[in-house]
From Swiss-Prot:
Pathway: Protein modification; protein sumoylation
Cellular compartments per GO CC: nucleus; postsynaptic cytosol; presynaptic cytosol
Subunit field text: Interacts with RXRA. Forms a complex with KAT5-TIP60 and UBE2I in response to UV irradiation. Interacts with RPA1 to maintain it in hyposumoylated state during S phase preventing DNA repair initiation.
Cross-link (Glycyl lysine isopeptide (Lys-Gly) (interchain with G-Cter in SUMO2)): 648
Superkingdom assignment: Eukaryota
Active-site residue numbers: 785, 936, 1049
Region described as Disordered: 23-51, 327-388
Alphabetical list of InterPro entries matching this protein: Papain-like_cys_pep_sf, Peptidase_C48_C, Sentrin-specific_protease
Family listed: Belongs to the peptidase C48 family.
Protein name per the record: Sentrin-specific protease 6
Length: 1132
């Protein structure tokens, strides 16, 4: 009866607890069961899942040989008012059961439970049905498998501290849960302790009846423990398997639960992972002598890989293996056989420490990360699972995919493996990877193009190539349009200067020979044809013996002269490979069609050059035979004779001077440094190489290195100290950097364009104040053309007049008695009638000269209607000159010219300028056309951009004056320059002079940018604002000596700077004319002069280096001798 009553009261209490669990949000289906007071919070109940029962308790009960045959166990208290009844599910099989819910995917077991231990003898129930409901722990029926983390195999020196499970009881006074703490077990004396919080493993082991210690705790409601003693020494047991004092082994405990007692002290018998297959049903392990092979059965030999752990859908995090991140569904590296791998005690990983205490959450996470981080090992893959064995888990993030894919076996091809090449795994003696040099496949450009082109060249029946000239016998013509080569004909278009355009069509069937030279510096083709072709060309091109264009003294049918047997086509540039293949294919097909053997042939450069030289020599001899030719033909003869002479000297063929100037050669060879100027230890040295020296060859453009070098050489070598202190020369890169566009920068978004420009070059003047200088030289390069900008007197705010040191009062009184008064008079005091009356004789004199441009009365009227802001001194000088002409109107023109020439001669030594008023400078027609076109563009631009134009005078804006033939402006300027010595004062005003050797349109934008730079620089240096507008800082484009080719612009820039100090400008009133600043013949030797300077510096610097080396060698020898002498003396 008492048992029935107690059973009924226990059932009632259980139903009440069941009702409470159903009222919770999890519905009572969680795998943590706790029975507590009704006022307990849900959070506390959730934490009790790990504190309900301990597997250690059931171990103690199983060790006594008790077996559970009931589906439930009733634990009664001494008071009889509470009975704890625990329901567990039993599995139909003897395998293990996987525990879920662990956040790191590990199955935690109790202490001292090896994976090799079995649970034979415990039959798990399938569940318990109460009131129509089945109670279980929300786990599947699959057999449980304990992972390596559940083994809890600690090294001997590690203490293990366990938290005993919490025993629950129901007291009348509402007693709370009390914990029982077992004393920590230790293998060796060590300070390392591990705290393991146990969880319930009801699905893995059958819950046994409570141990006597547990019953005692529940009965007396106190924390106590039943102590056991060693049967041999009588001391208290601290370990259930071995006595710590005498070392005796407890055999009864070793055989409990039919587990094999495998200790870590045994070096043999490696700890193996569990198989992924469950043991055969009904097979049970023996109590003693259980080996790994018997425990796993044949599955160990068949399955060499670990289990594929399927992750929950909610845990699609990246899985780390061997320190690398593998995406979900990714392939896992190949796993090796665990039987072949052994591990020592020192290689064991630390187990994970779990605790339900909230205060230790952070520490647990840190330790968990440390324990899961793989150690460097020579295994193919390191698993994130901490274990003591050879852990090689093949992880797959996709659960569905893992279930569908069959498990791999050694017999199956390993498709999910990543194999590293053997060469990549090779290591040297030190264990480092062997880095083999990257071998690049050598690509033969010739072979790469020949194959595809040779297959498709039959599809090309014609090719258009650019040719620069043609020679037919002794006839030479330049070609403007390209030549068309086809299988049927060769079409050449000639545009004669005096005749109508002619189209020459050579039928390929009439050709007898084609010789081809495809050298980069001389690509040329020599064609030979039947005599009828020469006769046709002679008529078509109007060749005659009188003109000596084609001399066939021996008859057309008996052509023996070398120069008359070829039709020569000289190409613009060397053909690329594709064009060459097509061209040669067409010529080869022509020879096949004409059935001519050896029709196409390639010749060397020397042979091609000798043929061209022979053609030119023959032409010169034919010209010498006819001395009674017309004047224009004589010019042509002399023109061609120059070519012949150059060909003799250089053994190189050029068509004419223009072509020779345009033919640029490319520097080939190793680059070697010649000099550093100034040499060390001076700062700012410029290195000049042999490649830079190549730029000084005729026809080559000067580069920035030569420009910067020579400008620095002028300042340091040729200028006086006081002159060098008055100037500042910017680098040739200054303006480019000033005007360079940059990417958007958040720091400069609020700055203006002027400030952004200045910010790029603000450090260029950190050591100099440019406003204290008189002249600032800025070399500029735009569109591959060099020109010079000179900022004059940037520190002045207005024009400044100073006494003229070269003023001659006697000369002024003799020529113009009123000149002194007119120099100080204003524009309103000038007589307009005298200017009008003097203008006509001047124009008449200019019209009488055949080399001057026609000047109409409208131009004179334009001069008279100039704005009032024109400089007074210039107007006074013009009026003085015109008055002088009016006085001498009745005299002969020669007298007036001689008088002007005398004045110019007298002022030559004083001003450093020689002005020949009526000399004309001839330039090539092409340059004249370009300048005229630029002049027209500048005139149009002046109308459109009146506000942007710098303050250029009428001579720059007038198209006629922009050309070199505008001598009216030259004459006016010459009188101004020639009469500098007649003025008592000279003007110094802030201005920007642009000196261009190839005058074109006004470069107003350059002056504008320089003005804006000066404004910001003034604000930065002086701390105040100042305007550098066109009213304050005027811009002018003075007339300077002009180049007669297209490559000497840089040489002229250097000469402008040099002449600025050799023949200084005294008066800076605008406009100014410097056309005769230096003699033109000097420019022909300027390149050679700079070259010689560099070579001399190289020689001197090489000598200095040699002397320095010799001195160092002598010093080292002397030191060595002294050391030797001292050493020998000490030994004696």
């Amino acid at each position: 009866m008492a048992a029935g009553k107690s059973g009924g009261s226990a059932g009632a209490l259980f139903l009440k607890a069941l009702d409470r669990s159903e009222s919770k949000r999890d519905g009572g289906f969680k795998n943590n069961w706790s029975f507590d007071h009704e006022e307990e919070s849900e959070g506390d109940a959730d934490k009790d899942g790990a504190n309900l029962l301990s597997v250690e308790d059931e171990d103690s009960e199983i060790s006594k040989g008790k077996k559970l045959n009931r589906r439930s166990e009733i634990v009664a208290t001494s008071s009889g008012d509470f009975i704890l009844k625990t329901y567990v599910r039993r599995s139909k099989t003897d395998g293990f059961k996987t525990l879920k819910g662990n956040p790191i995917g590990l199955n935690m077991l109790s202490n001292n439970k090896k994976l090799s231990e079995s649970t034979a003898g415990t039959a798990l129930c399938s569940g318990t049905v109460v009131h129509g409901r089945r109670f279980h722990h929300a786990h599947s029926q699959t057999p449980g498998i304990r992972t390596a983390a559940q083994r809890k195999e600690y090294p001997p020196y590690v203490h293990k501290a366990e938290n005993s499970p919490v025993m629950l009881s129901h007291g009348q006074g509402g007693d709370h849960i009390m914990k029982k703490t077992e004393e920590s077990e230790s293998y060796v004396e060590s300070e390392i302790k591990r705290k393991v919080q146990q969880k319930r493993h009801c699905s893995t082991y059958q819950l046994s009846p409570l141990s006597p210690a547990s019953k005692k705790c529940l009965t007396h409601l106190e924390v106590s423990e039943q102590r056991e003693y060693c049967p041999k020494c009588g001391k208290e047991k601290e370990n259930q398997t071995k006595c710590q004092s005498c070392g005796i082994v407890f055999h009864n405990d070793l055989q409990r639960n039919c587990r094999q007692a495998v200790t870590l002290n045994e070096p043999t018998g490696p700890l193996l992972r569990t198989s992924i297959h469950q043991n055969s049903g009904g097979q049970k392990s023996q109590n003693t002598g259980l080996t790994a092979k018997k425990f796993y059965g044949n599955s160990v030999d068949k399955i060499p890989i670990d289990i594929l752990v399927t992750c929950d859908d909610s845990r699609h995090n990246y899985i780390q293996t061997n320190g690398k991140v593998i995406l979900p569904g990714g392939k896992i590296p190949k796993l090796t056989n665990p039987k072949e791998r052994k591990i020592s005690v020192s290689d064991l990983n630390d187990p994970i420490i779990l605790s339900s205490d909230d205060d230790d959450d952070d520490d647990d996470r840190t330790k968990r990360r440390e324990s899961t981080s793989p150690k460097p090992a020579d295994s193919a893959c390191s698993s994130p699972v901490p274990s003591t064995g050879k852990v090689e888990a093949a992880l797959n993030a996709d659960a569905c995919r893992a279930e569908q894919e069959p498990r791999s076996s050694p017999a199956e091809p390993e498709l999910n493996t990543i194999v590293i090449p053997r060469k990549a795994r090779m290591k040297d003696q030190l264990g480092n990877s062997i880095s083999t040099p990257l071998k690049r496949r050598k690509v033969n450009s010739h072979a790469a193009f020949i194959h595809p082109m040779s297959l498709s060249c039959q599809n090309f029946e014609s090719v258009i190539l650019n040719c620069r000239s043609i020679r037919v016998g002794t006839l030479f013509r330049l070609l403007v349009e390209p030549v068309i080569f086809s299988l049927e004909s060769i079409t050449i278009h000639l545009d004669g200067p005096e005749s109508d355009p002619v189209d020459i069509i050579l039928n390929t069937s009439d050709l007898t020979k084609c010789e081809w030279c495809n050298v980069r510096k001389l690509p040329v083709v020599f064609l030979q044809a039947i005599p009828a072709v020469y006769q046709k060309l002679s008529m078509q091109l109007q060749m005659s013996k009188e003109d000596k264009v084609w001399n066939d003294c021996k008859g057309i049918n008996r052509i023996t002269s070398l120069e008359e047997q070829y039709i020569i086509l000289i190409f613009q540039t060397g053909l690329d490979h594709q064009a060459e293949v097509v061209f040669e294919s067409i010529i080869t097909d022509i020879g096949i069609r004409n059935n001519v053997p050896n029709f196409f042939a390639k010749i060397l450069f020397d042979e091609a050059n000798s043929r061209l030289v022979a053609c030119t020599r023959s032409y010169e001899e034919s010209i010498k035979g006819n001395c009674a030719q017309k004047e224009n033909k004589v010019k042509t003869v002399s023109f061609e004779s120059k070519i012949q002479l150059r060909s003799k000297q250089e053994l190189q063929f050029f068509d004419d001077d223009e072509e020779a100037g345009e033919s640029h050669t490319i520097f080939i060879g190793p680059v070697e440094k010649l000099i550093v100027y100034p040499p060390p230890p001076a700062k700012g040295g410029i290195s000049v190489t042999n490649e830079d020296l190549h730029c000084l060859s005729e026809g080559e453009f000067l580069n920035d290195v030569i420009i910067d070098f020579y400008l620095k050489y002028l300042v340091l070598e040729k200028l006086k100290k006081e002159d060098a202190d008055r100037i500042h020369i910017f680098s040739s890169f200054f303006y480019k950097r000033l005007n360079q566009r940059e990417r958007r920068n958040p720091e400069t978004t609020n700055l203006s364009i002027q400030q952004k420009r200045h910010g790029r070059v603000k450090t260029w003047t950190r050591h100099v104040d440019i406003f204290e200088k008189d002249f600032i030289f800025v070399p500029l390069n735009e569109a591959a053309h060099w020109f010079l900008a000179v900022v004059c007197f940037p520190g002045l705010e207005k024009p400044k007049y100073e006494p003229n040191p070269h003023y001659h009062e006697n000369a002024v009184m003799q020529k113009t008695p009123s000149a002194e008064d007119s120099c100080v008079s204003s524009a309103s005091e000038m007589g307009a009638c005298s200017q009008n009356s003097a203008a006509k004789p001047v124009i008449k004199k200019m019209l009488n000269r055949k080399h001057c441009l026609a000047v109409t009365d409208s131009s004179a009227a334009q001069e008279e209607s100039e704005p009032c802001y024109r400089r007074n001194a210039y107007s006074v000088k013009c009026s003085m000159k015109k008055k002088n002409h009016a006085i001498n109107e009745n005299e002969e023109p020669s007298n007036g010219e001689s008088t002007c020439q005398d004045i110019c001669d007298r002022t030559q030594s004083e001003n450093g300028l020689r002005d020949e008023c009526f000399s004309s400078v001839h330039h090539p027609d092409a340059l004249s056309k370009i300048r005229l076109n630029y002049g027209d563009q500048s005139a149009d631009g002046g109308k459109l951009l009146e506000d942007e134009l710098i303050d250029f005078s009428e001579d720059q804006d007038d198209p006629d004056d922009s050309s070199d033939d505008g001598l009216l402006a030259d004459e006016n300027y010459s009188s101004e320059i020639g009469q500098w010595h007649l003025k008592p004062t000279v003007c110094k005003q802030p201005c920007i002079l642009l000196m261009d050797s190839l005058r074109g349109p006004s470069r107003s934008n350059v002056v504008k940018i320089l003005r804006e730079y000066l404004e910001v620089e003034w604000e930065v240096k002086k701390g105040s604002k100042r305007s550098f507008s066109k009213d304050v800082m005027k811009g002018s484009n003075p007339k300077v000596p002009q180049q007669n080719n297209f490559s000497d612009c840089g040489v002229y820039v250097l000469q402008y700077v040099e002449s600025f100090f050799e023949n200084p400008v005294l008066n800076f009133e605008l406009p100014m004319n410097l056309m005769n600043w230096f003699p033109p013949p000097r420019m022909k030797t300027k390149r050679e002069e700079i070259r010689n300077i560099i070579l001399k510096l190289q020689e001197s610097q090489s000598k200095d280096k040699k002397l320095l080396k010799d001195s160092l060698a002598e010093t080292s020898l002397g030191d060595g001798a002294e050391q030797y002498a001292s050493a020998s003396g000490g030994s004696e």
